Amino acid sequence: MATGDDIPTFKLVLVGDGGTGKTTFVKRHLTGEFEKKYVATLGVEVHPLIFHTNRGQIRFNVWDTAGQEKFGGLRDGYYIQGQCAIIMFDVTARVTYKNVPNWHRDLVRVCENIPIVLCGNKVDVKDRKVKAKTITFHRKKNLQYYDISAKSNYNFEKPFLWLARKLLGDPNLEFVAMPALAPPEVQMDPTMVAQYEQEIAAAANAELPDDDEDL
């Protein structure tokens, strides 16, 4: 998607099982939602998400599948020329985490060495099934991981900031203003947030299991 301006622009491929909240997540960014384009040949919506950094603007053209993944794998055209990716699962549904290696395999088959963030969505839901200590796939594959909650905007910007730093080669890059986001539909419990952040920090220092079983 060529644009007439000089904003650095990157194709971001958003994948994961159906129902994990990918569309809800991308729609939080209001200007991206307003300016999205539908690509009929591939059946995808492309949301241009602009973020303001201390080095100027950066745009992620986020490709959202519009639910096609419910009918099997995605076509290569979805992945081709992808420059970065987010793999999403639902922390309230173990099977969506169990399928992460399949999404990762499909992704790297087409886009070999791109920066990838793994996101566990719906951490606002009290009945969390996939706990921090069981989320090890990203450590084995050198991906970044974030807990997120699309409906509360919790950690919304984190995956984009990490990817922007990788893509622009600047570990000190910062976002200087938050994009306009849809108002939170739910509130995160601060005690729960503190607990989860502690668990993630502890899990990052734990030894990895020897086998390939990720659950």
From Swiss-Prot:
Q: Domain Small GTPase Ran-type spans what residues?
A: 6-170
Q: Where is this region: Switch-II?
A: 67-83
List localization entries.
Nucleus
In this chain, the stretch annotated as Switch-I covers 36-44
Recall the GO molecular function terms of this protein's record.
Answer: GTP binding; GTPase activity
Q: Which UniProt keywords apply?
A: GTP-binding, Nucleotide-binding, Nucleus, Protein transport, Transport
GO biological process: one example: protein import into nucleus
List GO terms (cellular component aspect).
cytoplasm; nucleus
Cited SMART domains:
RAB, RAN, RAS, RHO
Query: Which residues does the annotation say bind GTP?
Result: 17-24, 35-41, 67, 121-124, 149-151
Q: Which InterPro entries match?
A: P-loop_NTPase, Ran_GTPase, Small_GTP-bd, Small_GTPase
Tell me, how does this one assemble? Found in a nuclear export complex with RanGTP, exportin and pre-miRNA.
Q: Which family, according to UniProt? A: Belongs to the small GTPase superfamily. Ran family.
| Functional note | GTP-binding protein involved in nucleocytoplasmic transport. Required for the import of protein into the nucleus and also for RNA export. Involved in chromatin condensation and control of cell cycle.
Quote the protein name from its UniProt record. Answer: GTP-binding nuclear protein Ran
* Protein source organism: Brugia malayi (Filarial nematode worm)
